[in-house]
Protein backbone atom coordinates (compact mmCIF):
# COMPACT_ATOMS: atom_id res chain seq x y z
CA UNK A 1 0.00 0.00 0.00
CA UNK A 2 1.51 3.31 -1.13
CA UNK A 3 1.63 5.31 2.10
CA UNK A 4 4.60 7.05 3.72
CA UNK A 5 5.38 5.15 6.93
CA UNK A 6 6.47 6.87 10.12
CA UNK A 7 9.11 4.19 10.64
CA UNK A 8 10.83 5.25 7.38
CA UNK A 9 11.23 8.89 8.45
CA UNK A 10 14.06 10.70 10.24
CA UNK A 11 12.38 12.11 13.34
CA UNK A 12 15.27 13.46 15.43
CA UNK A 13 14.54 17.01 16.55
CA UNK A 14 11.24 17.03 14.67
CA UNK A 15 7.89 18.03 16.16
CA UNK A 16 5.66 14.99 15.63
CA UNK A 17 1.88 15.06 16.15
CA UNK A 18 0.36 11.59 16.45
CA UNK A 19 -3.39 10.99 16.15
CA UNK A 20 -4.12 7.92 18.25
CA UNK A 21 -7.34 6.16 19.17
CA UNK A 22 -7.36 6.41 22.97
CA UNK A 23 -11.15 6.33 23.20
CA UNK A 24 -11.22 3.97 26.18
CA UNK A 25 -14.17 3.24 28.49
CA UNK A 26 -13.94 5.23 31.71
CA UNK A 27 -16.17 4.69 34.74
CA UNK A 28 -16.00 7.34 37.47
CA UNK A 29 -12.48 8.31 36.46
CA UNK A 30 -11.27 4.70 36.22
CA UNK A 31 -10.24 3.18 32.88
CA UNK A 32 -12.06 -0.15 32.57
CA UNK A 33 -10.27 -1.41 29.44
CA UNK A 34 -6.84 -0.10 28.47
CA UNK A 35 -6.43 -2.17 25.29
CA UNK A 36 -6.20 0.90 23.04
CA UNK A 37 -3.69 2.62 25.31
CA UNK A 38 -1.47 -0.47 25.29
CA UNK A 39 -1.74 -0.66 21.50
CA UNK A 40 -0.55 2.95 21.15
CA UNK A 41 2.67 2.48 23.14
CA UNK A 42 4.99 1.06 20.43
CA UNK A 43 4.34 4.02 18.11
CA UNK A 44 4.93 6.54 20.90
CA UNK A 45 8.10 4.77 22.04
CA UNK A 46 9.56 4.71 18.51
CA UNK A 47 8.98 8.46 18.13
CA UNK A 48 10.53 9.21 21.53
CA UNK A 49 13.51 6.91 20.98
CA UNK A 50 14.24 8.63 17.66
CA UNK A 51 14.49 11.99 19.40
CA UNK A 52 11.20 13.54 18.33
CA UNK A 53 9.24 16.13 20.29
CA UNK A 54 6.04 14.11 20.56
CA UNK A 55 2.46 15.35 20.79
CA UNK A 56 -0.40 12.85 20.95
CA UNK A 57 -4.10 13.57 20.64
CA UNK A 58 -7.26 11.49 20.50
CA UNK A 59 -11.00 11.78 20.82
CA UNK A 60 -12.87 10.41 23.83
CA UNK A 61 -16.62 9.96 23.74
CA UNK A 62 -18.83 12.56 22.10
CA UNK A 63 -18.24 15.90 23.86
CA UNK A 64 -19.89 19.14 22.81
CA UNK A 65 -17.52 21.18 20.65
CA UNK A 66 -16.16 24.28 22.33
CA UNK A 67 -16.98 23.03 25.83
CA UNK A 68 -14.45 21.38 28.17
CA UNK A 69 -15.90 18.76 30.49
CA UNK A 70 -14.18 16.57 33.06
CA UNK A 71 -16.27 13.60 31.92
CA UNK A 72 -14.72 13.73 28.43
CA UNK A 73 -11.21 14.71 29.49
CA UNK A 74 -8.18 12.60 28.60
CA UNK A 75 -6.77 13.19 32.12
CA UNK A 76 -7.12 9.51 33.18
CA UNK A 77 -5.40 8.51 29.93
CA UNK A 78 -2.50 10.90 30.58
CA UNK A 79 -2.07 9.41 34.04
CA UNK A 80 -2.07 5.85 32.70
CA UNK A 81 0.34 6.70 29.86
CA UNK A 82 2.69 8.21 32.43
CA UNK A 83 2.59 4.99 34.48
CA UNK A 84 3.11 2.71 31.48
CA UNK A 85 5.93 4.74 29.92
CA UNK A 86 7.62 5.67 33.18
CA UNK A 87 7.76 9.36 32.27
CA UNK A 88 5.72 12.45 33.05
CA UNK A 89 2.96 12.95 30.47
CA UNK A 90 1.45 16.42 30.90
CA UNK A 91 -2.03 17.07 29.51
CA UNK A 92 -2.48 20.31 27.58
CA UNK A 93 -6.04 21.67 27.56
CA UNK A 94 -5.67 24.67 25.22
CA UNK A 95 -3.32 23.53 22.49
CA UNK A 96 -4.67 24.44 19.05
CA UNK A 97 -2.66 27.69 18.80
CA UNK A 98 0.65 26.27 20.03
CA UNK A 99 2.33 23.67 22.24
CA UNK A 100 5.67 23.77 24.06
CA UNK A 101 7.39 20.38 23.74
CA UNK A 102 11.07 19.45 23.63
CA UNK A 103 12.79 16.58 21.79
CA UNK A 104 12.45 13.38 23.82
CA UNK A 105 9.36 14.75 25.60
CA UNK A 106 5.75 13.58 25.27
CA UNK A 107 2.67 15.73 25.83
CA UNK A 108 -0.94 14.60 25.53
CA UNK A 109 -3.27 17.10 23.88
CA UNK A 110 -6.80 17.26 25.26
CA UNK A 111 -9.74 15.55 23.53
CA UNK A 112 -9.66 16.81 19.94
CA UNK A 113 -13.43 16.54 19.64
CA UNK A 114 -13.72 19.46 22.04
CA UNK A 115 -12.25 21.70 19.31
CA UNK A 116 -14.78 23.70 17.30
CA UNK A 117 -14.77 22.44 13.72
CA UNK A 118 -13.30 18.99 14.41
CA UNK A 119 -16.33 16.94 13.34
CA UNK A 120 -16.97 19.09 10.25
CA UNK A 121 -13.35 18.66 9.06
CA UNK A 122 -12.92 22.44 9.18
CA UNK A 123 -9.96 23.46 7.01
CA UNK A 124 -8.87 26.34 9.24
CA UNK A 125 -8.70 23.99 12.24
CA UNK A 126 -6.84 21.37 10.19
CA UNK A 127 -4.27 24.01 9.20
CA UNK A 128 -3.76 24.90 12.87
CA UNK A 129 -3.15 21.22 13.66
CA UNK A 130 -0.66 21.04 10.78
CA UNK A 131 1.16 24.16 12.01
CA UNK A 132 1.92 22.41 15.31
CA UNK A 133 4.18 19.81 13.73
CA UNK A 134 6.87 18.95 11.20
CA UNK A 135 5.39 15.46 10.79
CA UNK A 136 1.79 14.36 11.28
CA UNK A 137 1.25 10.66 12.01
CA UNK A 138 -2.15 9.03 11.57
CA UNK A 139 -2.18 5.93 13.78
CA UNK A 140 -5.89 5.69 14.66
CA UNK A 141 -7.34 3.03 12.36
CA UNK A 142 -10.53 3.03 14.43
CA UNK A 143 -11.34 6.55 13.18
CA UNK A 144 -9.90 6.21 9.65
CA UNK A 145 -13.44 6.01 8.25
CA UNK A 146 -14.30 9.49 9.58
CA UNK A 147 -13.35 12.59 7.58
CA UNK A 148 -12.61 14.94 10.48
CA UNK A 149 -10.02 17.63 11.04
CA UNK A 150 -7.68 15.37 13.06
CA UNK A 151 -8.11 12.31 10.83
CA UNK A 152 -8.34 13.78 7.33
CA UNK A 153 -7.96 17.55 7.04
CA UNK A 154 -4.60 17.69 8.81
CA UNK A 155 -3.25 14.93 6.54
CA UNK A 156 -3.94 17.18 3.56
CA UNK A 157 -2.32 20.23 5.20
CA UNK A 158 0.69 18.87 7.11
CA UNK A 159 4.23 19.34 5.78
CA UNK A 160 4.70 15.57 5.99
CA UNK A 161 1.89 13.07 6.66
CA UNK A 162 2.61 9.43 7.47
CA UNK A 163 0.91 6.27 8.62
CA UNK A 164 1.85 5.06 12.09
CA UNK A 165 2.88 1.46 12.87
CA UNK A 166 -0.51 0.52 14.34
CA UNK A 167 -2.46 1.87 11.36
CA UNK A 168 -0.10 0.26 8.87
CA UNK A 169 -0.22 -3.12 10.63
CA UNK A 170 -4.01 -3.02 10.37
CA UNK A 171 -3.97 -2.03 6.70
CA UNK A 172 -1.32 -4.62 5.85
CA UNK A 173 -3.34 -7.39 7.54
CA UNK A 174 -6.63 -6.35 5.95
CA UNK A 175 -5.04 -6.07 2.51
CA UNK A 176 -3.55 -9.54 2.93
CA UNK A 177 -6.91 -10.91 3.99
CA UNK A 178 -9.19 -9.16 1.50
CA UNK A 179 -7.39 -7.45 -1.36
CA UNK A 180 -4.74 -10.12 -1.98
CA UNK A 181 -5.99 -13.22 -0.11
CA UNK A 182 -4.54 -16.68 -0.50
CA UNK A 183 -7.47 -18.79 -1.71
CA UNK A 184 -9.76 -20.33 -0.73
CA UNK A 185 -11.17 -17.37 1.19
CA UNK A 186 -13.91 -18.06 3.74
CA UNK A 187 -15.90 -15.39 5.56
CA UNK A 188 -18.06 -15.75 8.65
CA UNK A 189 -20.66 -13.00 9.02
CA UNK A 190 -22.93 -13.10 12.05
CA UNK A 191 -25.23 -10.60 13.65
CA UNK A 192 -28.89 -9.84 14.07
CA UNK A 193 -29.72 -8.00 10.85
CA UNK A 194 -28.97 -8.36 7.15
CA UNK A 195 -29.69 -4.63 6.78
CA UNK A 196 -26.66 -3.64 8.90
CA UNK A 197 -24.37 -6.02 6.99
CA UNK A 198 -25.93 -5.75 3.52
CA UNK A 199 -23.02 -3.89 1.89
CA UNK A 200 -20.60 -6.22 3.63
CA UNK A 201 -22.39 -9.35 2.37
CA UNK A 202 -22.73 -7.91 -1.14
CA UNK A 203 -19.00 -7.16 -1.30
CA UNK A 204 -17.83 -10.44 0.23
CA UNK A 205 -20.00 -12.63 -2.00
CA UNK A 206 -17.94 -11.39 -4.97
CA UNK A 207 -14.66 -12.42 -3.36
CA UNK A 208 -15.13 -15.49 -1.17
CA UNK A 209 -15.34 -19.21 -1.88
CA UNK A 210 -17.55 -19.78 1.18
CA UNK A 211 -19.74 -17.34 3.10
CA UNK A 212 -21.01 -18.64 6.44
CA UNK A 213 -23.83 -16.64 8.01
CA UNK A 214 -25.06 -16.70 11.59
CA UNK A 215 -27.65 -15.17 13.90
CA UNK A 216 -30.59 -13.26 12.47
CA UNK A 217 -28.72 -12.99 9.16
CA UNK A 218 -28.75 -16.78 8.80
CA UNK A 219 -32.46 -16.83 9.68
CA UNK A 220 -33.19 -14.46 6.80
CA UNK A 221 -31.24 -16.71 4.42
CA UNK A 222 -33.11 -19.77 5.76
CA UNK A 223 -36.42 -18.00 5.13
CA UNK A 224 -35.22 -17.08 1.63
CA UNK A 225 -34.59 -20.77 0.98
CA UNK A 226 -38.15 -21.61 2.05
CA UNK A 227 -37.50 -23.01 5.53
CA UNK A 228 -39.81 -22.26 8.48
CA UNK A 229 -38.18 -20.06 11.11
CA UNK A 230 -40.99 -19.79 13.68
CA UNK A 231 -40.84 -16.54 15.62
CA UNK A 232 -37.08 -16.14 15.11
CA UNK A 233 -35.50 -12.78 14.39
CA UNK A 234 -35.28 -12.16 10.64
CA UNK A 235 -36.03 -9.48 8.03
CA UNK A 236 -38.93 -10.36 5.75
CA UNK A 237 -38.33 -7.34 3.52
CA UNK A 238 -34.81 -8.54 2.73
CA UNK A 239 -35.66 -12.11 1.72
CA UNK A 240 -35.43 -11.17 -1.96
CA UNK A 241 -32.07 -9.49 -1.32
CA UNK A 242 -30.83 -12.67 0.34
CA UNK A 243 -31.94 -14.65 -2.71
CA UNK A 244 -30.03 -12.26 -4.97
CA UNK A 245 -26.88 -12.75 -2.90
CA UNK A 246 -27.32 -16.54 -3.15
CA UNK A 247 -27.72 -16.22 -6.94
CA UNK A 248 -24.50 -14.17 -7.22
CA UNK A 249 -22.64 -16.77 -5.16
CA UNK A 250 -23.87 -19.66 -7.32
CA UNK A 251 -22.93 -17.82 -10.53
CA UNK A 252 -19.37 -17.48 -9.22
CA UNK A 253 -19.18 -21.06 -8.01
CA UNK A 254 -19.11 -19.83 -4.41
CA UNK A 255 -21.10 -21.40 -1.58
CA UNK A 256 -23.36 -19.98 1.11
CA UNK A 257 -23.95 -23.08 3.24
CA UNK A 258 -27.17 -23.03 5.25
CA UNK A 259 -27.61 -24.64 8.66
CA UNK A 260 -29.02 -28.17 8.59
CA UNK A 261 -29.78 -28.15 12.31
CA UNK A 262 -30.29 -25.38 14.85
CA UNK A 263 -30.75 -24.85 18.58
CA UNK A 264 -34.14 -23.43 19.51
CA UNK A 265 -36.03 -22.26 22.59
CA UNK A 266 -39.49 -20.89 23.30
CA UNK A 267 -38.21 -17.72 25.00
CA UNK A 268 -35.20 -15.44 24.64
CA UNK A 269 -33.96 -15.84 28.20
CA UNK A 270 -30.95 -17.35 29.97
CA UNK A 271 -31.65 -20.73 31.52
CA UNK A 272 -34.48 -21.72 29.15
CA UNK A 273 -34.67 -25.23 27.73
CA UNK A 274 -32.64 -25.56 24.54
CA UNK A 275 -33.60 -28.10 21.88
CA UNK A 276 -31.72 -29.20 18.76
CA UNK A 277 -33.93 -29.47 15.67
CA UNK A 278 -33.41 -29.96 11.96
CA UNK A 279 -34.21 -26.82 9.99
CA UNK A 280 -37.33 -28.35 8.43
CA UNK A 281 -38.82 -29.14 11.85
CA UNK A 282 -39.18 -25.60 13.20
CA UNK A 283 -42.65 -24.80 14.56
CA UNK A 284 -44.47 -21.49 14.95
CA UNK A 285 -43.32 -20.66 18.50
CA UNK A 286 -39.66 -21.66 18.07
CA UNK A 287 -36.82 -19.14 18.38
CA UNK A 288 -33.61 -20.10 16.54
CA UNK A 289 -30.76 -19.00 18.82
CA UNK A 290 -27.73 -20.99 17.61
CA UNK A 291 -26.53 -23.34 14.91
CA UNK A 292 -26.80 -27.03 15.75
CA UNK A 293 -23.92 -29.47 16.38
CA UNK A 294 -24.09 -31.06 12.91
CA UNK A 295 -23.93 -27.63 11.26
CA UNK A 296 -21.11 -26.53 13.56
CA UNK A 297 -19.05 -29.59 12.59
CA UNK A 298 -19.68 -28.94 8.90
CA UNK A 299 -18.67 -25.29 9.18
CA UNK A 300 -15.55 -26.24 11.18
CA UNK A 301 -14.56 -28.63 8.37
CA UNK A 302 -14.94 -25.81 5.83
CA UNK A 303 -12.76 -23.56 7.97
CA UNK A 304 -10.12 -26.29 8.11
CA UNK A 305 -9.82 -26.25 4.30
CA UNK A 306 -9.64 -22.44 3.98
CA UNK A 307 -6.38 -20.57 3.37
CA UNK A 308 -7.77 -17.20 4.52
CA UNK A 309 -10.56 -16.63 7.06
CA UNK A 310 -12.34 -13.33 7.78
CA UNK A 311 -14.63 -13.40 10.83
CA UNK A 312 -17.16 -10.74 11.80
CA UNK A 313 -19.95 -11.67 14.19
CA UNK A 314 -21.04 -14.67 16.29
CA UNK A 315 -23.34 -17.38 14.92
CA UNK A 316 -25.55 -17.62 18.02
CA UNK A 317 -26.49 -15.94 21.27
CA UNK A 318 -23.14 -16.90 22.80
CA UNK A 319 -23.79 -14.80 25.91
CA UNK A 320 -26.18 -17.58 27.01
CA UNK A 321 -24.34 -20.87 27.58
CA UNK A 322 -27.11 -22.97 26.05
CA UNK A 323 -26.67 -21.12 22.74
CA UNK A 324 -22.90 -20.62 22.78
CA UNK A 325 -21.67 -23.93 21.36
CA UNK A 326 -21.88 -22.93 17.70
CA UNK A 327 -19.78 -19.80 18.17
CA UNK A 328 -17.33 -21.71 20.37
CA UNK A 329 -16.85 -24.49 17.80
CA UNK A 330 -16.21 -21.95 15.04
CA UNK A 331 -13.89 -19.86 17.23
CA UNK A 332 -11.81 -22.92 18.05
CA UNK A 333 -11.83 -24.01 14.40
CA UNK A 334 -10.50 -20.62 13.30
CA UNK A 335 -7.88 -20.76 16.06
CA UNK A 336 -6.76 -24.28 15.08
CA UNK A 337 -6.68 -23.49 11.36
CA UNK A 338 -3.43 -22.95 9.49
CA UNK A 339 -5.21 -20.20 7.52
CA UNK A 340 -4.36 -16.52 7.80
CA UNK A 341 -7.23 -15.29 9.98
CA UNK A 342 -8.62 -11.82 10.64
CA UNK A 343 -11.34 -11.13 13.21
CA UNK A 344 -13.07 -7.89 14.11
CA UNK A 345 -16.20 -6.35 15.58
CA UNK A 346 -17.19 -5.93 19.22
CA UNK A 347 -19.16 -9.16 19.63
CA UNK A 348 -16.46 -11.11 17.80
CA UNK A 349 -13.77 -9.77 20.11
CA UNK A 350 -15.93 -10.68 23.12
CA UNK A 351 -16.27 -14.24 21.80
CA UNK A 352 -12.52 -14.49 21.21
CA UNK A 353 -11.92 -13.35 24.79
CA UNK A 354 -14.54 -15.75 26.16
CA UNK A 355 -12.92 -18.77 24.52
CA UNK A 356 -9.33 -17.65 25.10
CA UNK A 357 -8.18 -17.97 21.48
CA UNK A 358 -6.77 -14.48 20.86
CA UNK A 359 -3.19 -15.73 20.54
CA UNK A 360 -4.23 -18.13 17.77
CA UNK A 361 -5.93 -15.56 15.53
CA UNK A 362 -3.48 -14.10 12.98
CA UNK A 363 -4.80 -10.55 13.31
CA UNK A 364 -7.48 -9.07 15.54
CA UNK A 365 -8.81 -5.74 14.31
CA UNK A 366 -9.79 -3.16 16.90
CA UNK A 367 -11.15 -0.87 14.19
CA UNK A 368 -14.89 -1.31 14.73
CA UNK A 369 -16.66 0.80 12.12
CA UNK A 370 -13.48 1.25 10.07
CA UNK A 371 -13.02 -2.53 9.94
CA UNK A 372 -16.58 -2.98 8.68
CA UNK A 373 -16.21 -0.29 6.03
CA UNK A 374 -12.99 -1.90 4.79
CA UNK A 375 -14.83 -5.25 4.54
CA UNK A 376 -17.56 -3.46 2.59
CA UNK A 377 -14.97 -2.43 0.02
CA UNK A 378 -15.18 1.26 0.88
CA UNK A 379 -12.27 3.67 0.69
CA UNK A 380 -11.46 5.06 4.14
CA UNK A 381 -11.02 8.87 4.04
CA UNK A 382 -7.84 8.91 6.14
CA UNK A 383 -6.27 6.14 4.07
CA UNK A 384 -7.17 7.87 0.81
CA UNK A 385 -5.63 11.12 2.08
CA UNK A 386 -2.41 9.36 3.12
CA UNK A 387 -2.20 7.66 -0.27
CA UNK A 388 -2.69 11.00 -2.03
CA UNK A 389 0.15 12.55 0.02
CA UNK A 390 2.54 9.67 -0.74
CA UNK A 391 2.64 10.65 -4.42
Curated annotation (Swiss-Prot):
It catalyses: (2R)-3-phosphoglycerate + ATP = (2R)-3-phospho-glyceroyl phosphate + ADP. It holds the Pfam family PGK. The keyword Cytoplasm applies. Its EC number is 2.7.2.3. GO terms for biological process: gluconeogenesis; glycolytic process. Belongs to the phosphoglycerate kinase family. This is Phosphoglycerate kinase. It comes from Xylella fastidiosa (strain Temecula1 / ATCC 700964). The gene is pgk.
